[in-house]
Amino acid sequence: MSSLSKEAVLVHEALVARGLETPMRAPVQEIDNETRKRLITGHMTEIMQLLNLDLSDDSLMETPHRIAKMYVDEIFSGLDYSRFPKITVIENKMKVDEMVTVRDITLTSTCEHHFVTIDGKATVAYIPKDSVIGLSKINRIVQFFAQRPQVQERLTQQILIALQTLLGTNNVAVSIDAVHYCVKARGIRDATSATTTTSLGGLFKSSQNTRQEFLRAVRHHD
């Protein structure tokens, strides 16, 4: 991973050490993204033909390529650490020692069990130590880890570990509330339920007052 940013390497190594990295096999050989898209296009063509879809129809003929491009460049782009967001961290010269919260971060992910949509919002908080992070970078970190096949529990913890690693503090909290289309659109077909996951570190875990302050922020939009 020598071609990656220092921040990307640190985050990846922290997740691996904790057993929280997305399950990925070591590639037999490195292939570029254009080759990857070409190969996926071929496999999607076979899948659609097995479904008896007519790929000569002008509405369907480009679908395999569209899906391949979507997978590699968009909804699974977070599998590629070369796309890890550029992180701006500055010295905490202001001596901020109270909770900083970013609420209602929109995220769209993909259930790794059925490859259908997870649609939700995240709330992220941290108590600065020596560094503070550009607020938009929190949104970008959430979106990076959402752009993978995911389970919500792991996604929540990945965001937590990434921010703890980059900020040099355990005092981070993450909550995600999401609708899973593997529940909504198939199986039980429950269109109204949502899933909430929370991951707490440092004072958010050990201090009841800090934890309650965060949970009040999570509920603020209700």
Curated annotation (Swiss-Prot):
One of its GO terms (biological process) is tetrahydrobiopterin biosynthetic process. InterPro entries: GTP-CH-I_C/QueF, GTP-CH-I_N, GTP_CycHdrlase_I, GTP_CycHdrlase_I_CS, GTP_CycHdrlase_I_dom. Its EC number is 3.5.4.16. Keywords: GTP-binding, Hydrolase, Metal-binding, Nucleotide-binding, One-carbon metabolism, Zinc. GO terms for cellular component: cytoplasm. One of its GO terms (molecular function) is zinc ion binding. The keyword Metal-binding applies. Toroid-shaped homodecamer, composed of two pentamers of five dimers. This is GTP cyclohydrolase 1. It comes from Klebsiella pneumoniae subsp. pneumoniae (strain ATCC 700721 / MGH 78578). The gene is folE.
